[in-house]
Curated annotation (Swiss-Prot):
Catalytic activity, EC: 1.8.1.4
Cysteine-cysteine disulfides: 80-85
GO MF: dihydrolipoyl dehydrogenase (NADH) activity; flavin adenine dinucleotide binding; lipoamide binding; NAD binding
Residues annotated for NAD(+) binding in this entry: 220-227, 243, 278, 314
Protein family per UniProt: Belongs to the class-I pyridine nucleotide-disulfide oxidoreductase family.
InterPro entries: Class-I_Pyr_Nuc-Dis_Oxidored (IPR050151), FAD/NAD-bd_sf (IPR036188), FAD/NAD-binding_dom (IPR023753), FAD/NAD-linked_Rdtase_dimer_sf (IPR016156), Lipoamide_DH (IPR006258), Pyr_nuc-diS_OxRdtase (IPR001100), Pyr_nucl-diS_OxRdtase_dimer (IPR004099), Pyr_OxRdtase_I_AS (IPR012999)
Protein name, per record: Dihydrolipoyl dehydrogenase, mitochondrial
């Protein structure tokens, strides 16, 4: 990937900044939320302010482009910040604290609390506070970087024009040299089940329940299903996840890790019905919901009764009413916008990134695409190695991986070796009395190059970034094994697993 400093130097030599600075003076006088009879002129117009969109807008402005970002919602940050990644992590963190205090964990550490009570409204208030601070932070960054924020639904009304429309019908026209679509994704509906965000909820509703349900059924045991199911299970709900596939954790997870992960969640009280499909859901007169299920291959029907039904079978690209059809931009069979390696659509000055294009629907993937996309507009190199994009499940313990799984390597016919190290043998995990899980490293059998890293355990979401860096630089298992890691730390388990992969045995197990 071409470094950002080179892009800046390249632009400076071309006089790009001087040429655009005059335009930026005009942009700085435009309010963050503006509607006028006069069109706004821009070099780059970003539709959507989620992780991909807002980062792309800021980067474009930093590169000297006169930049506009259009957002249909009142707050910036998209799904991730408002009703996704951020609020779910607040609830996951706080529900974990409650679980430790309410169960036997604290007592086993010599911390005796006579009575632990859940104040759900206070917990939700802390979640909202975190979201508000971060959405306000984006608004501040826009102002600081002179990104013009236009509130409204953005539609491409010409190859060089975007029109933003508010709920009251007011419009703002933006004339623009480049258009970047970063509209993200939306919840995939379940045929025959209507979401009311009260007792039949999507991930959005599950983040704002008014009380802890007695019984919760989750359709889908992927990342979102196990995360949100964990929140309410910790807070006292009886949770059952119904999953069509034969494993938990979604697509891409290593099967050995998945089996161990499922075992740990079940030990916590989480129930699973795998290889099972939901055939319908009926609300009863008493407010409860009968969920009809049967084996994925067909068979005897069964009914599970619950207070709340959470539908999380995935997400789909949000591309409706963007004006793509009028421009002749056709979607692929999965509803995604086809782009080339520079994120250009069939119309060269219209780009797309994030959940609306191919690849994993991850916030950090969208951020990377946003940055390199606008660097490409400025003449920089455009490259991203999707094999180095990590995935994380923020349960406790966490699950994280980057690179290939064992199943993928077998399917591709790649010869590999495996190194494992359990957290039960890690000093820091022992002192923390938090020893579930392991680190699993997959290395090339002859070259020793790291091909994949799979972590189940405390702090996996942080540790996986060391693995991502190693993969990005093409490191061998021995390279990591010979890097001195501080003691006692959880990351020593990562080093030990690489020792096991490279030399056949770890030191401490």
């Amino acid at each position: 990937m071409q470094s950002w400093s080179r892009v800046y130097c390249s632009l400076a030599k071309k006089g790009h900044f001087n040429r655009l600075s005059h335009g930026l003076q005009g942009a700085s006088s435009v309010p963050l939320r503006t509607y006028s009879d006069q069109p706004i002129d821009a070099d780059v117009t970003v539709i959507g302010s989620g992780p991909g969109g807002y980062v792309a807008a800021i980067k474009a402005a930093q590169l000297g482009f006169k930049t506009v970002c259009i957002e249909k919602n009142e707050t910036l940050g998209g799904t991730c910040l408002n009703v996704g990644c951020i609020p779910s992590k607040a609830l996951l963190n706080n529900s974990h604290y409650y679980h430790l205090a309410h169960g036997k964990d604290f007592a086993s550490r010599g911390i005796e609390i006579p009575e632990v009570r859940l104040n759900l409204e206070k917990m939700m208030e802390q979640k909202r506070s975190a979201v508000k601070a971060l959405t306000g932070g984006i608004a501040h960054l826009f102002k600081q970087n002179k990104v013009v924020h236009v509130n409204g639904f953005g539609k491409i009304t010409g190859k060089n024009q975007v029109t933003a429309t508010t709920a009251d019908g007011s419009t703002q026209v933006i004339g623009t040299k480049n258009i970047l679509i970063a509209t993200g994704s939306e919840v995939t509906p379940f045929p025959g089940i209507t979401i009311d965000e009260d007792t039949i909820v999507s991930s959005t509703g599950a983040l704002s329940l008014k009380k802890v349900p007695e019984k919760l059924v989750v359709i889908g045991a992927g990342v979102i299903g196990v995360e949100l199911g964990s929140v309410w299970q910790r807070l006292g709900a009886d949770v059952t996840a119904v999953e069509f596939l034969g494993h938990v954790g979604g697509i891409g997870i290593d099967m050995e890790i998945s089996k161990n992960f499922q075992r740990i969640l079940q030990k916590q009280g989480f129930k699973f019905k795998l290889n099972t499909k939901v055939t319908g859901a009926t609300k009863k007169s008493d407010g409860k919901i009968d969920v009809s299920v049967e084996a994925a291959s067909g068979g005897k029907a069964e009914v599970i009764t619950c207070d709340v039904l959470l539908v999380c079978i995935g997400r789909r690209p949000f591309t409706q009413n963007l004006g793509l059809e009028e421009l002749g931009i056709e979607l692929d069979p999965k509803g995604r916008i086809p782009v080339n390696t520079r994120f250009q659509t069939k119309i060269p000055n219209i780009f797309a990134i994030g959940d609306v294009v191919a690849g994993p629907m991850l916030a950090h993937k969208a951020e990377d695409e946003g940055i390199i996309c606008v660097e490409g507009m400025a003449g920089g190199a455009v490259h991203i190695d999707y094999n180095c994009v990590p995935s994380v499940i923020y349960t406790h313990p966490e699950v994280a991986w980057v690179g290939k799984s064992e199943e993928q390597l077998k399917e591709e016919g790649v010869e590999f070796k495996v190194g494992k190290f359990p957290f039960a043998a890690n000093s820091r995990a022992k002192t923390n009395a938090d020893t579930d899980g392991m680190v699993k490293i997959l290395g090339h059998k002859s070259t020793d190059r790291i091909l994949g890293a799979h972590i189940l355990g405390p702090g996996a979401g942080e540790m996986v970034n060391e693995a991502a860096l190693a993969l990005e630089y093409g490191a061998s298992c021995e390279d990591v094994a010979r890097v001195c890691h501080a003691h006692p730390t959880l990351s020593e388990a990562f080093r030990e697993a690489n020792l096991a992969a490279s030399f056949g045995k770890p030191i401490n197990f």
